[in-house]
């Protein structure tokens, strides 16, 4: 057995897709080894009597035969298979499940909507950064889960019987993307939401997180179109107009929307617009994980950390043998600089967090080689799994690390969309200066400094005589002033 005993698998038999996640436990965190997803569209096989067609069941079994091959290497006690909305509804679910268990060689559990909502919330709590008090929205194929909670604790759980497959069959059956079909789909979704809206609003939230294919598709569209990753009602309405303009489902073309997501995109979009409107949501971001992650973390009995980003940074520092003392030293200098200029530059708290995160990882490129360390660092951060950081935040971190020294590549700072371009430039300047002044790798050799910002001009004041006593330091700072001046960042050092 050996190396397979640390493997865990979670399978989710959803109404639209079947998913399998295989992970390995590594030092209290999970490393993803396999993700397999197949569009089975089980919900589309339900007739008016809620009986599943033989074709739909066969599609499901065929998919499970693929999964079964991968499961043979994993201890049965470390596998969880759950079925959701369609198999809760189907009158002949028993037939499907009996054969599914035979194929997989392990039990299949049909979970209630509330249990599904709880697991989704756990998956989000383990993998998503940001404020503690959250609303989680997951639009599935045949049900939509809405959960409020604080930290690891849920405060209200709802599973509503509407989903992107059932709404597709009901309101877009003619494949027409006209305003009237969207209106009908949204109106119906709002009616389903209305009875639970008050309780959700009563519990309240500081952040709203989406955890489903629809939200993933929106994120992909927004990244492809160079928008920032925050989903707002205004952006949803713009995408709806674009869909209406396309006219028919088979002609739906939106930059960044993949073919496999296109079929259920309009119905998912209508449900999401209804949720935004009914609950008065200002903005939503994509979750780092959901149902499958909830199942895996549940099997591992890992506690939810208050600060997921910190856990992620710690794990990566250990894995790449980063000098943690030096990372902290640079972070301390950068935080000091940030605090001195934040009012003048109107910087937000999240920008400070991201700057400190960049400091914690700035030497990761050395684990590959000293030559081109910034490029190695950017590559690693762009491609590592970083729970707690959104895709846009990862891109910003990679861009900051790419520009931590040497001439500045301004276009890369403008291509990220986690923060406005000007803020990315400002964070980059602070990171570069912090790295320079902590470079002797000793706390007692970091000088006392004041940094003042006046619009784009930075004035750095060093102790009397410091520049004369540190000729190499002076040379490095002169070079830095020159590099910053090339991109019109005025820097004066006294």
Swiss-Prot record:
Pfam families the UniProt entry points to: Ppx-GppA, Ppx-GppA_III
GO biological process: guanosine pentaphosphate catabolic process; guanosine tetraphosphate biosynthetic process; nucleobase-containing small molecule interconversion
UniProt pathway annotation: Purine metabolism; ppGpp biosynthesis; ppGpp from GTP: step 2/2
EC number from the UniProt entry: 3.6.1.40
Cited function: Catalyzes the conversion of pppGpp to ppGpp. Guanosine pentaphosphate (pppGpp) is a cytoplasmic signaling molecule which together with ppGpp controls the 'stringent response', an adaptive process that allows bacteria to respond to amino acid starvation, resulting in the coordinated regulation of numerous cellular activities.
Assigned protein family: Belongs to the GppA/Ppx family. GppA subfamily.
Protein name as catalogued: Guanosine-5'-triphosphate,3'-diphosphate pyrophosphatase
